[in-house]
């Protein structure tokens, strides 16, 4: 964890120097009964954009963090002023203590309203997972963001949905064969309200997220058990925009 902290500190320092969009979130997960610290950064440039986030999990019954998960992605687009400006190449790495490392490569398409209040990104990616057999080495991703929804200043709705192929072994069937699933789905819609606007602290937001997951509970068996079906995990907390 010390190496992770040093790495995150260096990344945040570089992000501030580059005038990137950075935020930190602290949320309480009601089902898993732990706190999750999330650090996010997004930076657009003349050649595309860079995005990363890191989740650090803090079980309340232990003094040390339980684990972490990280994603870092680079969108490459040096043809932004052409008719294909909405289409970018995409490269990504993700992994952590609770998930196998994976490399992803593919394309993304960015849609937005004229004032950029509403944004949607569609991704089609080749995905290879370390030490895992996949029937189809692909992932489909949707990312969205909406500002001032319903005409309410400071109310934002954002999130993502991922669908990919990955083999999970959940135990043994009655006939003795391994109980294996082949596809995974996860979505985490978030809603945040800029409560700080009322007392001269526009960085502060209150809100949370709900995680919808199918065949994704393997890392959380103490909570969900051998549940291969849809699991729902609500969380709430605070977000600080730097």
Question: Which ranges hold each PLM region?
Answer:
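Short loop/turn motifs that connect adjacent beta-strands in outer-membrane beta-barrel proteins
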Residues: 21, 47-49, 77-89, 112-120, ...
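Cleavable N-terminal export/targeting peptides
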Residues: 1-21
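Membrane-embedded beta-strands of outer-membrane beta-barrel proteins
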Residues: 39, 72-74, 78, 105-107, ...
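Outer-membrane beta-barrel "beta-signal"
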Residues: 230-242
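Transmembrane beta-strands of outer-membrane beta-barrel pores
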Residues: 26-32, 56-60, 91-97, 111, ...
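Outer-membrane beta-barrel transmembrane domain signature
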Residues: 129-219, 240-242
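Short glycine/proline- and aromatic-enriched beta-strand/turn motifs that initiate or cap beta-hairpins
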Residues: 20-62
């Amino acid at each position: 964890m010390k190496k992770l902290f040093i790495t995150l500190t260096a990344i945040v320092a570089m992000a501030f120097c580059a005038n990137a969009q950075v935020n930190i979130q602290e949320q309480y997960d009601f089902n898993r009964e732990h706190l999750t610290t999330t650090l996010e950064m997004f930076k657009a440039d003349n050649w595309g954009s860079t995005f990363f986030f890191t989740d650090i999990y803090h079980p309340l019954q232990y003094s040390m963090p339980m684990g972490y998960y990280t994603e870092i992605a680079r969108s490459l687009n040096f043809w932004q002023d052409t008719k294909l400006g909405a289409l970018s190449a995409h490269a990504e790495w993700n992994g952590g203590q609770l998930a196998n490392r994976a490399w992803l490569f593919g394309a993304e398409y960015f849609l937005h309203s004229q004032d950029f209040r509403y944004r949607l990104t569609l991704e089609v990616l080749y995905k290879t997972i370390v030490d895992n057999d996949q029937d189809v080495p692909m992932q489909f991703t949707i990312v969205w963001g909406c500002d001032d929804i319903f005409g309410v200043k400071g109310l934002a709705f954002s999130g993502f949905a991922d669908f990919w192929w990955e083999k999970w072994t959940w135990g043994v069937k009655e006939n003795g064969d391994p109980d294996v699933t082949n596809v995974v789905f996860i979505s985490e819609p978030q809603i945040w309200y800029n409560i700080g606007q009322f007392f001269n602290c526009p960085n502060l937001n209150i809100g949370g997220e709900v995680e919808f997951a199918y065949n994704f509970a393997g890392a959380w068996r103490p909570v969900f058990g051998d549940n291969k079906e849809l699991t729902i995990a609500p969380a709430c907390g605070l977000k600080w925009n730097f």
